[in-house]
């Protein structure tokens, strides 16, 4: 149910032109502890993989878009295909599938009480939902293997030191920090620029340097034709806040 609710909320936020950034956080004392242990117990008694394929996939606006990489149409991994920035405010324990969800966010802000753990190895499972792809890109191969093998607990402060979190803040300032970052993006940055740069960064993970340069050159030509570029120059010269058009 959580995955369905998240997909519905992401869809609503993406389709609302007034929303420029999306914050995902947990209800209660934790961000997301992963799969329900009772469900895992039922799966193990039923012989394993039955029912796994029934997990909710990407929202329809992503799943039905032919221009989206199929890799970003799976459960959890669709966050990179969302055209708006997604900020994960990690407010407590985050494990397993919950960690995968956080890894696919664009920005992660952790509370000091946050605890990150992969948990997979202690459940007899493997790195699911793209964790083996995303985690090394954030913390490096050695740290990723350590976290995956040991399933040890990583604090919010260590997560920031590793690059797993962009910031570590006091618990009582977590949401204020996330909202301030989202508001900064909404007030100062062109939504189209964020959309295109997000596409560039995730595409570059599977491109050669030359392919990434070619894409950048094509997108720069298109950017110079936009009202965003005109406004970007105008507000700087006129020394006023920008008024960028919505995507």
Report each predicted region and the residues it spans.
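CoA-thioester-processing core
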Residues: 75-83, 89, 95-149, 162, ...
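Well-ordered beta-strand positions
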Residues: 107, 146, 150-152, 158, ...
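A short acidic, glycine-rich active-site loop
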Residues: 45-70
């Amino acid at each position: 149910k959580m995955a369905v609710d998240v997909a519905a909320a992401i869809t609503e936020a993406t389709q609302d032109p007034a929303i420029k950034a999306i914050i995902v956080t947990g209800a209660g004392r934790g961000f997301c502890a992963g799969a329900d242990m009772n469900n895992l117990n039922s799966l193990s008694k039923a012989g394993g993989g039955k029912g796994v394929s029934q997990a909710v996939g990407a929202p329809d606006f992503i799943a039905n878009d032919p221009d989206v990489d199929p890799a970003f149409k799976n459960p959890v991994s669709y966050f990179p295909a969302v055209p708006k920035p997604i900020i994960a405010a990690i407010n407590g324990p985050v494990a397993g599938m919950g960690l995968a969800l956080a890894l696919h966010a664009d920005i992660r802000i952790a509370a000091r009480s946050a605890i990150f753990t992969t948990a997979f190895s202690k459940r007899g499972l493997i790195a699911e939902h793209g964790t083996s792809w995303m985690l090394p890109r954030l913390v490096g191969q050695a740290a990723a293997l350590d976290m995956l093998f040991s399933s040890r607990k990583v604090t919010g402060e260590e997560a920031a030191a590793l690059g797993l979190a962009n910031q570590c803040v006091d618990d009582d300032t977590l949401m204020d920090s996330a909202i301030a970052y989202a508001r900064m993006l909404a007030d100062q940055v062109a939504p189209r620029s964020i959309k295109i740069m997000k596409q560039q960064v995730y595409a570059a993970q599977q491109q050669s340097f030359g392919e990434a340069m070619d894409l950048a050159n094509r997108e720069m030509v298109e950017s110079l034709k936009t009202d965003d570029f005109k406004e970007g120059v105008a507000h700087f010269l006129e020394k006023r806040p920008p008024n960028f058009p919505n995507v």
